[in-house]
Amino acid sequence: MPKSLKIILFSVSGFVGLLVLVAAALLLFVDANAYKPRLEAAASEALGMEVRVGGRLGIGFFPGFSITMEDVHIRNRGADLVSAKEARLGIDLFPLLHKQVRIAKIALKHPGVSIERDRGGRYNFENAEAAGGTLPALDLAKVSVSDGTLRYADKQSGDGFEAKDCSLDVRRLRLAEAKSPDLMKNLSFTAELACGVIRTKDFTVSDLKFSADGKNGVFDLKPVTMRIFGGQGSGNIRADFSGAVPTYQVHYSLPQFRIEEFYKTMSKQKIAEGSMDFSANLSMQGKTVNEMTQTANGAASLRGENLTLNGSDLDLEFSRFESSQNFNLVDVGAIFFAGPVGLAVTKGYNFASILKGSRGNSAIRRLVSEWKVERGAAQALDVAMATNENRIALHGGLDFVNGRFNDVTVALIDSKGCAKVRQKISGTFRKPVVEKPNILKTLTGPALRLLKKGRDIFPGGECEVFYAGSVAPPK
């Protein structure tokens, strides 16, 4: 072995041995807990929040120098924002020789994060004095989270969710020094996230997973996978913060989800059964949810075959209409709004009214619900379904910006596509009106006798074709 190489190896070995000796001495003689108040004060000043360590502090040197803290709490404006059973900071050893602390890794075990938005639109992690301030540069090799819980509550809208059993692995997390409004433009990272279950007041998502990659203000989340309504959904999201206004692109599909699982979120009774396919492609922009909704453009699709509608024999009800004239097409048309997008439209609907018909079942051979989305409003392109003997179609639009029905008409159509019976819906999603507002106050009211016979509208046998889409008439 060359002499120079021997010298290098001996020097390296000696240096490593010296580090081991120093580490052992520190472990024996340094009480890390004596420095806890200083650490809490420094962290509080850096974050602009109250940081407290309720448990012990420990120092480790293998596989690298680290500080372990137990029972960590971060509070802002008097309320807990983040808590963790254990937090470990991996610190680069060499900068310490120059009295510099450089954190390379952060690992959190059993953390809980509570984010809240008050009625004024302010988040609990925001500080008025820090608004518009400069954020320090950040460079972390790795951030990991295990068995975490995230809770979000929006007191302004009443929405919220809880995500449990979450793990997060972030690599190469870098933030250039910048003003706080430019945070996303100067942030870069790669990450993988998984959550066992996410619960909202309307539905539950399980086995959520996605990979994320962000650089120069552009963030790609793909693939985003989850289980919802008994189906396996997948898609991707791109968020671009490089411009003056953030832009978003969302592509999502949920094949073969169970319609009975969807209706479980609204009724304890089994409204319908069968598998359906849902997909959506949307683009939007804005800094708030309202702005994003107002600029939403794209398309949404819902399709299904061989479905069963419980509690009502539609063909029998339609055949009895001549004598009874006491059937509500709106009840039947509600099935066109099944799936993720329909949650906003149907949350105020009492689906038990569908079950008050002839106490039979209906076979739906085919259902198609195709929508075009422009500026936050969905317009029906091809919306219809066929039973064994009849077809029902829908015209009109859904205004998600204002939460209203735009001249929606549900019609019973003949083999030529002409309307035999029609019923109009207007008003808000929560308080829609059918034909005459003074008769129907909400969709949850009693069935209406508001159906108009096609022959009364179009005398002489000729009519304007109401439906010419892809759902063929029964044979």
Please provide the spans of the model-predicted regions.
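Extended terminal
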Residues: P2-V16, S283, K287-N297, S301, ...
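N-terminal amphipathic/hydrophobic interface segments
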Residues: K6-L9, L19-I74, L175, V205-S206
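Extended lipid/amphipathic-ligand handling interfaces
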Residues: A43, G54-G60, I74, A84-V101, ...
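Extended hydrophobic secondary-structure segments that form protein cores and membrane-embedded regions
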Residues: K105-L108, V143, T190-L193, Y252, ...
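Transmembrane beta-strands of outer-membrane beta-barrel pores
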Residues: H110, V197-R199, F241, Q256, ...
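Right-handed parallel beta-helix
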Residues: T190, C195-S211, I364, V368
